[in-house]
């Protein structure tokens, strides 16, 4: 599991930062990539990374402001043009379906793979399978905006091979049956319960990716005990009133959410273009005063998520 930040700026592109898009690479877990937001030129940013459009399985949109969605039509079309055939699902607030369908229709863009568009109308679970569970809550951003909590389900423990070898069970088809938790009988009549030969499960990771938002309770709830919290930091602490007026957060407010939620790690993104050069480091300094395990994303930077 790895983050690749494709765009870390706020509102409009700048020379140093493109607008919002985050790839969550799940190559080891499911051989796929999930994308969170898709601002303009996202597909161009992808060219400079290891992200492959054909591997993008899901796109989660936080809200419908242009700096989070204007790259969608181009990416969807290019994925088809480049030979993508596997299904893709887009999740987002009401209106995302109309935006995509009109853009593709007017531009006569033909998508040759199965494309599903899911409009989120209420908080709660938006996706779940045997590996992951994705929950969402409304944030505070003036228009409908969602944050996402991605929960990796616990992974079954490893088969205790040494324990089996000690009692004379040799590698073979029996190992798989025991790994599956079956009760098996050996040739000598011994009964073995597979569950007795499986180690403790590996706890799944929790990732929280928030859209644009003021400081709000929903952010804390989504981030509770997260392994990684990705939070916007559009403004410095001295501009807290401006952040409130424009439905955004300061770096210090992001750190406060991470602290309250008992998150393990905080990554700041959505940085205003007013912070050029190294001036953005002041945002990092302010956040670390409250929450030491804070990092600030820059375009094309990757962050592995270890167990």
UniProtKB/Swiss-Prot annotation:
Keyword rRNA-binding: no
Top-level lineage group: Bacteria
Name of the top EC class for this enzyme: hydrolase
Annotated protein name in UniProt: Ribonuclease Z
One Pfam family per UniProt: Lactamase_B_2
Reported function: Zinc phosphodiesterase, which displays some tRNA 3'-processing endonuclease activity. Probably involved in tRNA maturation, by removing a 3'-trailer from precursor tRNA.
Residues the record lists as binding Zn(2+) 2: 67-68, 212, 270
Annotated EC: 3.1.26.11
Record key words, sorted: Endonuclease, Hydrolase, Metal-binding, Nuclease, tRNA processing, Zinc
Cofactor: Zn(2+)
UniProt family annotation: Belongs to the RNase Z family.
Catalytic activity: Endonucleolytic cleavage of RNA, removing extra 3' nucleotides from tRNA precursor, generating 3' termini of tRNAs. A 3'-hydroxy group is left at the tRNA terminus and a 5'-phosphoryl group is left at the trailer molecule
GO terms, molecular function: 3'-tRNA processing endoribonuclease activity; zinc ion binding
Organism: Bacillus anthracis
Active site, renumbered: 67 (proton acceptor)
Subunit structure: Homodimer.
Cofactor note: Binds 2 Zn(2+) ions.
PANTHER family (UniProt xref): ZINC PHOSPHODIESTERASE ELAC PROTEIN 1
